[in-house]
C-alpha cells in the first residue's frame, strides 16, 4: 500500500471529510468568497461543493466609487465570479457607491459590459436584477460612458427580460427618453413584459414632468402582470392609472409613491381615476413617501379620498417654516384615511406649535394603525398617553418609535421621565410592543 492510499484511510480522516453534503453546504453558505476558495482546496469533495448552485443564487456586487488600493481588485473579482458561477445566479444586486471621477465610471462601464455579456451567454435563470443609485445625470458620467453603459444594459434586458420577475433601477437619474428606452427592452419582440415587481423610484432625473410624456405612458402599457410598482409622483397621471386598470387589475397589490419637493407634483389627478383602479384592483394598497412636501394645500391635492392608502411618511428633513402648520393635515386630511391607514411616519420641525393632542387623537381614530414613528418636538408625557391608550385597547399599535426633540443640550430630565414611564408599562412594552423612545437635543 503506497503513501497516498494510507492518507485516505477512514480511520485517519478528519470527521470533516465525512460531513454530510447538506451540512457541508451550510458551512460553505456562511463563508465569504476568500474562505470558500481556501476551503475548496481541502479535498475533492469540498472542491465539488464549491460549485453547488445553492451557494451562488443570490449575489450582491459592490463597487467602490473612490480610488483605493483596498478596492482595486473589485472590478476583476466581479468578472471572475460571473464567469465562474454566473450560470447559477437567480438574484443579482449591483452597487456603485458615489463615483469620484470619470476614470472610475469608465472602469465600471467596461466591467459591466463584460459582466452583462458573460451573464447573458451563460445564465437562463435570473429572476431579479437591481442596479441602484447610479445617478447617471452627474458630471462624472460623460456622455460616451453613459451611452455605452445604457447600450450594454439595454441589450442584456432584451435577452434576459423574459426571465426577470423583479427589476430595480432606483436612483438611475435618466432622461424620460433614456428611461423609456431601458424599460422597453424588457418587452423586446413580445410587446409585453413579464416583470411583476418594478422599482423606478428616482429612475428619472429631478424636475422632469414624466406624467406628461406619451412615451412613458406607452412604455408602462407594456407591463401586464405587475404585482408591485414603486415610482415617483411626477410619473402619476390619469393615463397611467388607466393603463394599470386595463392591464394589471388582476395582479396589482402594492404601489409605493415618492413625492419630493424638487419633483413636479402639481398635476391634476381625478379622484375617479383612483376610484376606478381601486374598484378593479381590489387588493391594492398605496404607500406614500413625502420629502419636504408638507403644506396642507399640496398634500390635499395629492392625497385624494378615493386612494386606498396603507401608509404615509412625511419628512421635512429638519427644515423649519414658521408660516407652515402641520395641524390641518393631522386634524382634517389624514383622518380621511382612518379606515385603511396602518403605518404613519413623521419627521418634522414643529418648534413653533404643539401637536401632542392632535397626534394622539389621530392615532385613536385610525383603528388599523399598528406602526407609528415620529421625530418631532413633543412633551414626554405624550408617550405615556399613547401607552395608556394601548393598554386600554383604544389603539392597535405594535410598533412605537419616538424621538422627542428638545431645545436644551441636556436631556437628563426627559430621560428620567422616560425611564419612569418604561417601568410603569414594562409588562406591556416587553410583551407586545416594538418600542424605542429617546429624547434628542435639537440645537
From Swiss-Prot:
Residue intervals of the F-box domain: 16-61
Superkingdom classification of source: Eukaryota
GO CC list: SCF ubiquitin ligase complex
Record's keyword terms, sorted: Ubl conjugation pathway
PROSITE patterns: FBOX
Entry-linked PANTHER family: F-BOX FAMILY PROTEIN (PTHR10706), F-BOX ONLY PROTEIN 39 (PTHR10706:SF160)
Subunit structure: Directly interacts with SKP1 and CUL1.
This protein's name: F-box only protein 39
Amino acid at each position: 500500500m503506497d503513501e497516498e492510499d494510507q492518507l485516505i484511510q477512514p480511520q485517519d480522516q478528519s470527521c470533516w471529510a465525512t460531513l454530510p453534503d447538506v451540512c457541508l453546504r451550510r458551512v460553505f453558505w456562511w463563508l465569504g468568497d476568500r474562505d470558500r476558495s481556501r476551503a475548496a482546496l481541502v479535498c475533492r469533495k469540498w472542491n465539488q461543493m464549491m460549485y453547488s448552485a445553492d451557494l451562488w443564487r443570490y449575489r450582491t456586487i459592490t463597487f467602490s466609487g473612490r480610488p483605493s488600493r483596498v478596492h482595486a481588485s473589485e472590478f476583476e473579482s466581479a468578472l471572475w465570479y460571473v464567469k465562474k458561477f454566473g450560470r447559477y445566479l437567480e438574484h443579482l444586486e449591483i452597487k456603485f457607491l458615489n463615483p469620484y471621477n470619470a476614470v472610475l465610471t469608465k472602469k465600471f462601464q467596461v466591467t459591466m459590459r463584460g459582466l452583462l455579456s458573460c451573464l447573458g451567454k451563460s445564465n437562463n435563470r435570473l429572476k431579479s436584477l437591481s442596479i441602484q443609485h447610479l445617478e447617471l445625470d452627474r458630471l462624472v458620467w460623460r456622455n460616451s460612458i453613459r451611452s455605452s453603459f445604457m447600450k450594454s444594459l439595454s441589450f442584456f434586458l432584451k435577452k434576459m427580460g423574459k426571465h426577470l420577475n423583479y427589476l430595480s433601477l432606483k436612483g438611475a437619474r435618466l432622461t424620460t427618453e433614456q428611461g423609456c428606452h431601458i424599460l422597453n427592452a424588457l418587452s423586446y419582440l413580445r410587446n409585453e413584459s413579464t416583470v411583476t415587481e418594478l422599482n423606478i423610484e428616482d429612475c428619472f432625473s429631478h424636475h422632469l414632468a414624466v406624467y406628461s410624456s406619451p412615451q412613458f405612458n406607452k412604455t408602462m402599457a407594456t407591463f401586464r402582470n405587475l404585482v408591485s410598482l414603486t415610482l415617483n409622483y411626477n410619473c402619476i397621471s390619469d393615463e397611467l392609472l388607466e393603463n394599470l386598470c386595463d392591464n394589471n387589475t388582476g395582479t396589482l397589490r402594492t404601489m409605493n409613491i415618492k413625492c419630493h419637493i424638487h419633483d413636479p407634483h402639481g398635476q391634476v389627478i381625478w379622484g375617479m381615476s383612483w376610484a376606478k383602479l381601486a374598484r378593479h384592483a381590489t387588493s391594492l394598497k398605496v404607500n406614500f413617501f413625502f420629502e419636504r412636501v408638507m403644506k396642507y394645500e399640496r398634500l390635499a391635492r395629492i392625497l385624494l379620498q378615493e386612494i386606498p392608502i396603507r401608509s404615509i411618511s412625511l419628512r421635512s428633513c429638519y427644515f423649519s417654516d414658521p408660516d407652515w402648520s402641520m395641524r390641518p393635515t393631522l386634524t382634517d386630511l389624514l383622518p380621511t384615511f382612518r379606515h385603511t391607514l396602518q403605518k404613519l411616519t413623521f419627521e418634522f420641525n414643529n418648534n413653533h406649535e404643539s401637536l401632542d393632542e392632535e397626534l394622539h387623537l389621530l392615532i385613536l381614530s385610525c383603528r388599523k394603525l399598528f406602526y407609528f414613528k415620529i421625530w418631532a418636538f413633543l412633551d414626554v408625557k405624550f408617550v405615556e398617553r399613547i401607552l395608556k391608550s394601548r393598554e386600554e385597547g383604544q389603539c392597535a399599535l405594535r410598533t412605537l418609535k419616538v424621538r422627542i426633540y428638545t431645545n436644551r443640550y441636556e436631556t437628563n430630565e426627559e430621560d428620567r421621565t422616560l425611564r419612569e414611564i418604561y417601568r410603569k408599562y414594562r409588562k406591556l412594552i416587553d410583551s407586545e410592543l416594538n418600542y424605542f423612545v429617546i429624547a434628542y437635543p435639537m440645537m
